[in-house]
């Protein structure tokens, strides 16, 4: 099964990063995302919580129910299945984080399988959020039906960790602005993969065009929105990216720097 995620991030990742908690507050204030409590927890977060509970010693097979609306629904299903004790009590209108705390406070060693994949490399990350009416105003009206399926998480990679790279099945050689054909060679690095590798080691690395003498950062090239790199991201799980252009523009205006996006097929 093909998975399709979209990532929004600074177009100049070597410059000072935006304040990601401030970006989160702006998105909540504008109701681009909704507080992740009660029935506004996205399905992806509910399924991740269920997966983590299913990994407990002695638990039954993984459980998934399309009728789940809250994190408490997930817990109730696992209590009924015998994966959690009958005495466990959680807030019916709480968050996934509230339920995890209640489970652990009950003496159950629930691991971090409910978190998103890159959490261990992060200095900060948000809960998974559902899109709100503010996102509806910024979304492609022809694709608005997809918005309920989005799960949105903000994260910042720790400075001591390698940068995060958005790279997938759709990534291929880029085009230099003003040129008509894809370019494979990027001397002195080698091919475009070698250039990506050099920037992965140092975000400040750029490339000098051998003919024009012009300098290009990695993301100055046209990757047809199939490559991203940096430390600050907003991930739209199950999002394509093409429908987010107005959001990207609004975000750039809000945080005072140009933003871009990339989509990943895997």
Regions found by a protein language model. Give the residues of each.
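Generic detector of bulky aromatic hydrophobic side chains
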Residues: 3, 24, 71-75, 95, ...
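Generic hydrophobic, helix-prone segments enriched in Leu/Val/Ile
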Residues: 23-29, 195-197, 234
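Cys/His-rich short segments
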Residues: 145-225
């Amino acid at each position: 099964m093909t998975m399709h995620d979209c990532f929004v991030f600074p177009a100049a990742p070597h410059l000072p990063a935006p304040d990601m908690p401030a970006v989160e507050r702006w998105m909540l204030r504008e109701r681009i995302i909704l507080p992740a409590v009660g029935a506004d927890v996205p399905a992806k977060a509910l399924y991740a919580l269920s997966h983590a509970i299913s990994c407990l010693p002695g638990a039954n097979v993984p459980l998934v129910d399309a009728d789940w609306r809250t994190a408490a629904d997930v817990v109730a299903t696992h209590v009924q299945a015998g994966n959690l004790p009958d005495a466990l009590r959680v807030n019916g209108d709480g968050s996934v984080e509230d339920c995890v705390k209640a489970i652990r406070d009950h003496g159950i060693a629930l691991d971090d399988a409910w978190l998103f994949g890159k959490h261990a490399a992060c200095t900060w990350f948000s809960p998974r959020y559902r899109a709100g009416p503010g996102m509806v105003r910024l979304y492609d009206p022809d694709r608005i039906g997809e918005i309920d399926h989005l799960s949105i998480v903000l994260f910042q990679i720790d400075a001591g960790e390698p940068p995060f790279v958005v790279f997938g099945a759709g990534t291929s050689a880029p085009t230099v602005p003003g040129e008509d054909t894809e370019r494979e060679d990027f001397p002195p690095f080698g091919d475009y993969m070698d250039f990506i590798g050099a920037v992965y080691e140092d975000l400040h690395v750029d490339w000098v065009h051998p003919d024009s003498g012009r300098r290009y950062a990695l993301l100055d090239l046209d990757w047809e929105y199939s490559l991203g790199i940096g430390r600050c991201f907003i991930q739209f799980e199950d999002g394509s990216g093409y429908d987010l252009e107005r959001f990207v523009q609004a975000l750039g205006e809000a945080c005072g720097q140009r933003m871009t996006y990339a989509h990943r097929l895997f």
